[in-house]
Amino acid sequence: RDLRMSRGLGDVYKRQPYKAWGFGDAPDQLADLVLTGIKTATASAYDLYFMEGEEDPLPQSGDYSIILNSKDEAVCVIQTTKTTVVPFDEVSKEHAYKEGEGDRSLAYWRDVHEDFFAEEFAETELEFNGQTSILCEEFKVVYRAIDVN
């Protein structure tokens, strides 16, 4: 069933397109950070949206997403509030903090995301480096499908 209808969201979101997805290699942990309000941003590799066969449109302000856990269960609905594209080496400490991971520092963010993006790019013919364009996305939770304990 459609989460929007099954949770009484039909009237609010009926005409809104949305995507359903989980966060990287740790969907449960990162979804929990979203639910607790710690994680209010994410990042993705800009160039990978334009790969042949890629069907995901570039996120834009106002977009809705259903966040899934590792069992593909809906956790919450978020709305993108801001997107910016910057080179990997220029992702700000503010963005790293909003991502809510680890100690929330830029050094931690770079360490974890350098490995993550390098792995993603290894599956393509593209090269990942410090000048690779990163889509920084900020969002807010507009509906919680799962209560935080």
Predicted regions and their residues:
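Short, surface-exposed secondary-structure edge patches
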Residues: G53-L58
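Loop/turn positions that initiate beta-strands
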Residues: G62-S65
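Short beta-strand-centered aromatic/proline hotspots
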Residues: V75-T83
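Long, low-complexity intrinsically disordered regions
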Residues: D115-N149
